[in-house]
Amino acid sequence: MKTKIYLLFITTLFFCAGCGNKSGGQKQESVSAAKDTYVNPMFPEGADPSALFHNGKYYYTHGTEDKIMLWETSDITDMAHAVCKIVWKPQDPSNSCHLWAPEIHYINDKWYIYYAADDGNTDNHQLYVLENSSPDPMEGKFEMKGSIITNPEWNWGIQATTFEHKGVRYLAWSGWPKRRTNAETQCIYIARMKNPWTLDSPRVLISKPEYEWERQWVNPDGSRTAYPIYVNEGPQFFHSKDNKTLILYYAASGSWSPYYCVGMLTADAESDLLDPASWTKSSVPVFQQSLENEVYGPGGLSFVPSPDGTEWYMIYHARQVTNGDTGSPETRNPRIQKIGWDAHGMPDLGIPVRAGGTLPKPSGTLLK
């Protein structure tokens, strides 16, 4: 979470250049690479990246504060030639600010975008859902389905993700146990869904900031938010190689700090996902800063397969400076790297790779 409004004018101009309709692809500067390689970052700026692979195309989005933009590409490592479109510009003042962590999903032959927004006061952040019935999300129109009521007190919520397991759809998100007073604690909740925009069960708390590595909110230089913020946010669903273990990755500690990192919750695929006892938390982060590679505060995961389905890639944001944005312009940018598997068939996220390093493109990528 962030408690200050960023200076976004330059960033907005950059992302919107050439981003108006499907026929006009966005052109941007990128580091040179051979046709069969790529370099990070994907964009110079951008937080909370998310992508989906569907029918040979990748659909990518990330937070831009006042609008939702969607990119379409057959090569997720070459965003310089992706087609870009603004798919949502809110008009309702109650949800027109701080549009954070959009995620696109394809559910029952329709497209849905989940995101968080508020009225200018981040204490009023809530979850919202957009729907588009067009077969192509770059066509048709995204329309507001409404806000997701996460609990009877109309409590705070950000960074929702949804997944289906054994015919049941679930929503996971970051929320408060109660309204903030002098400090803030963000926790991971899960609930069953009646449809893509309505919960069908009470929310269930499955993770709260408890380890020291989950409770960092002061930067190395002493800069900090106005009050303590203890963070579990950005849940993202994944699975073991044999699909017998479900995984919810999440981000922990302040996103403005180099200590922002990735934690992991696991559950047996046969267990009751609404029972907190079904979930086991890793006692250590599974993806964190690399001093050697000068990558700080990695988090905000999203997973996509290679075009031929033989590999998995992780998209995340990170920064190249140790002290982050408690009041300065956005310093995070999105990156992508291949993941591996350990001897037990669990994902091995590795370490964040250095920006500017040359990496092989995902298997099956059509080279241009």
Q: Where are the regions that the model predicts?
A:
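Bacterial Sec-dependent N-terminal signal peptides
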Residues: 1-30
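Carbohydrate-active catalytic/glycan-binding domains of CAZyme proteins
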Residues: 19-368
